[in-house]
Amino acid sequence: MSNTSDLSPVHVVGGGLAGSEAAWQLAQAGVPVILHEMRPVRGTDAHKTEQLAELVCSNSFRSDDAETNAVGVLHAEMRLAGSLIMACADAHQVPAGGALAVDREGFSQAVTAKLEAHPLITIVREEVTGLPPEEWGTTIVATGPLTAPSLAEAIQAQTGADALAFFDAIAPIIHFDSINMDVCWFQSRYDKVGPGGTGKDYINCPMDKEQYEAFVAALVEGDKTDFKEWEGTPYFDGCLPIEVMAERGPETLRHGPMKPMGLTNAHNPTVKAYAVVQLRQDNALGTLYNMVGFQTKLKYGSQTGIFKMIPGLENAEFARLGGLHRNTYLNSPVLLDGTLRLKSRETLRFAGQVTGCEGYVESSAIGLLAGRFTAAEKLGQTLTPPPGTTAFGALLGHITGGHIVADDEPGKRSFQPMNVNFGLFPPVDVPKPEGKRLRGKEKTVAKKRALSARALADCRQWLGLLGLGSGLEPAE
């Protein structure tokens, strides 16, 4: 490593997933960091603690399958790159079928401890209002989807472009000892065994047709929070409130988060449930479970009454009820360059959900890239962006090149947040077994395997050329 003792520090604004990962990558490369986090000086509607990298929605990092799932590929690439977020997630995983879910408190405490202990990282608890001052020099802004209005307004003034927004929602969490396990049972869908799992990682609450129809009707009629001042703000499609899905049609939920496929009632194996509500373990002790796909904007009074209609949850005690918050993000394809710098002020780099990516893993990955791009600049190195064939590159390409969709207005374009998915990757030739033509599901799986294998091979090559070691010790 080159001598970095005379380097001026990089300021990172925001101690969420992206900011924490960016700070770690910088420090591991030998670049001093000042990490600014406004909590506990100023809280948000969604955060409950002052820990860094607090998970405010689900505790799931989604699929850990690096062979046939794009987010699993991103997990693998981040591990290759020495990600702090992935190391702490792996160290604090809880059973969740094929998904990587974490004990949210243990996870954020581990991230906080690693950053506090790093000799090149200084954590400052203060709110940064508006854009960071010019005298700070190189700065990464990773203020997250709950970016304070003053900063959003400053960005608008700097760029002349409006920030964009969408709604995101939080699902309720239930105390395990209040769940009636004479009605519910443990099982992962199709008995799938995932990281740290057994194939029996979810609690399943069955409904017959009559119970389901009454439940859907109650959701549609329930008292909902009014957001008049945010009227016109769209929902992120991957995080629709449960009652909004119910309003789309009576069968929507049983083909979505309440689908009964791959599940057999342990108490009554011969009777197929019409719909199933799944609960996922939320902490390492197994004392808390969250309602999968049940993010909601129902008022608290309505939530408790309606969710207790679910068989097995008649006496449920809620550790946290569901909620809704407004997420702010940039029109990144217009405002940012290919390495996440603000075109109108190149000393500013943005990272995380404020750039228009969606999801814990994606936010962390963009923080990782922002940290590495910035470290290379500070060290006088040249760093080419990751190839578009990698999950890193596909996600970065969506944000900065823009998965830009034309709407009804000629010449007008819109940029929408998106999770990483194989649709963002360039096509790949699928190897054909001798004398066999692949069709249907077999062809789809083969294509995903080919995309994944190419991504990981190209990512290894990119990281090998990088010249920045990860230096990551196992998380505790």
UniProtKB/Swiss-Prot annotation:
Gene Ontology MF term list: flavin adenine dinucleotide binding; tRNA (uracil(54)-C5)-methyltransferase activity, 5,10-methylenetetrahydrofolate-dependent
Coiled coil: none
Subcellular location: Cytoplasm
EC number of the protein: 2.1.1.74
Gene3D superfamilies: FAD/NAD(P)-binding domain
Source taxon at top rank: Bacteria
GO cellular component annotations of the record: cytosol
Binding residues for FAD: 14-19
Enzyme class: transferase
Entry cofactors: FAD
Primary localization: cytoplasm
Catalytic activity of the protein: uridine(54) in tRNA + (6R)-5,10-methylene-5,6,7,8-tetrahydrofolate + NADH + H(+) = 5-methyluridine(54) in tRNA + (6S)-5,6,7,8-tetrahydrofolate + NAD(+); uridine(54) in tRNA + (6R)-5,10-methylene-5,6,7,8-tetrahydrofolate + NADPH + H(+) = 5-methyluridine(54) in tRNA + (6S)-5,6,7,8-tetrahydrofolate + NADP(+)
Family: Belongs to the MnmG family. TrmFO subfamily.
HAMAP family found in the cross-reference section: TrmFO
Function field: Catalyzes the folate-dependent formation of 5-methyl-uridine at position 54 (M-5-U54) in all tRNAs.
Protein name: Methylenetetrahydrofolate--tRNA-(uracil-5-)-methyltransferase TrmFO
Organism encoding this protein: Brucella anthropi (strain ATCC 49188 / DSM 6882 / CCUG 24695 / JCM 21032 / LMG 3331 / NBRC 15819 / NCTC 12168 / Alc 37) (Ochrobactrum anthropi)
Organism phylogeny: Bacteria, Pseudomonadati, Pseudomonadota, Alphaproteobacteria, Hyphomicrobiales
Gene: trmFO
